[in-house]
A protein has these predicted regions:
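Short structural boundary motif marking the start of a folded domain
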Residues: 1-4
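Short polar catalytic/cofactor-binding loops
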Residues: 7-11, 40-42
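Short, solvent-exposed loop/turn segments that connect beta-strands within catalytic domains
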Residues: 11-15, 79-80
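Short glycine/threonine/proline-enriched tight-turn/helix- or strand-capping micro-motif at secondary-structure
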Residues: 13-24, 53
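Conserved hydrophobic/aromatic beta-strand scaffold that supports enzyme active sites
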Residues: 20, 25, 69-71, 103-105, ...
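Glycine-rich beta-strand-centered segment in the early N-terminal region that forms part
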Residues: 24-41, 51-95
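NAD(P)H dinucleotide-binding glycine-rich loop of Rossmann-like/cofactor-binding domains
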Residues: 91-125
């Protein structure tokens, strides 16, 4: 899947601040849902993490983006609150990979169903 990531903390003005990358498509386990990302927003946490936090493993990419709206693409075996095709919105966990990608894994317990009257960009904001 396509994603945007970085390997070294640096100012946003650096040439390699954000790099287009390819990552394996994640697979949901447990209570995770796989969301096809339709919109993300940038908040101060993204900016602060980008400037100060390296990836946990220097060989891996760090992906930001935790404010998300999208469509449930798959569910883990223990998921009870969501099904494939539902529209969702959430602020993901900073302890996990971010949503600046085509797909994002998130624990169902921090996800809400997106109101149908709200568009993708507004839902992610």
């Amino acid at each position: 899947m396509k994603a945007i990531g970085y390997k070294t903390p640096s100012p946003i003005s650096a040439a390699d601040s954000f790099v287009d990358i390819e990552l394996p498509k994640p697979e949901p386990k447990g209570r995770d849902i796989l969301v096809e990302v339709k919109a993300i927003s940038v908040n101060p946490v993204d900016y602060k993490v980008r400037g100060s936090t390296p990836p946990a493993d220097s060989a891996e990419w760090k992906v930001l983006g935790w404010d998300v709206a999208g469509i449930v693409a798959a569910v883990g075996p223990d998921v009870t609150g969501f099904k494939v095709g539902e529209e969702v919105w959430y602020a993901g966990s900073i302890t996990r990979s971010g949503a600046n990608a085509e797909f994002h894994l998130v624990d169902e317990r921090i996800v809400g169903k997106k109101p149908s009257k709200i568009g993708w960009a507004d839902a992610a904001a």
